[in-house]
Amino acid sequence: RIRNGEHSMLVRVSQVPERSKGYLIDSSVATNFYPGSPQKILFRYKYVFKNLFQYGIVGEKDAGEQFFKGEQKQGFDFYSAHIFARKIGIIKSLAIGDFTVNFGQGLTQWQSLAFKKSVDVINIKREADVLRPYNSAGEINFHRGVGITLAKNNWQFTLFGSYKNIDANFVADTSQSQEDFISSLQASGYHRTKSESED
């Protein structure tokens, strides 16, 4: 039943012509040099059967990050994968892997595309499926785990569980008067230099 779907694959390689400062620094005397190539590489594969079933994988490497060597022996710096199904009996949607969650007009959480204030005062209500598959190369604004939405008549129930590591600045207290703490979360997704990789 799901064999006659549509396959799509995207491979994109881009590079800024000018060499960034991180490539020009002497690696023997500094730690903030970029050990990887200046190319940014994106790979995306997706299979979609109607609007009922899809799966896909995304791999992304930022400029300056290593590729299949050094800190990145597994290839891309970021991987994302998902399996997503809709309309299976009372199961309205089932997400396995990476997905987004959209609740409460964004007051609770809203990870899909959403517009804010505009001249159109009537268009203030956000509408989207509660669970959606994640196809992007962004490394922070999604959930990784399992989610399910059950629907019967006018009732709808959504349950999801998610666990993923995120980048953060960890500050160790040297005076022993305080506990170690996290000073900030990193949303850039860069892992080029030694300090970025340690975050």
Residues covered by each model-derived region:
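Surface-exposed extracellular loop regions of Gram-negative outer-membrane beta-barrel proteins
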Residues: N102-V119, N123
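Helix-hairpin-helix
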Residues: R1
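Active-site metal-binding loops of divalent metal-dependent hydrolases
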Residues: F99
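Signature for the C-terminal beta-barrel architecture of outer-membrane proteins
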Residues: N4-E6, R12-K40, K46-V48, L52-A81, ...
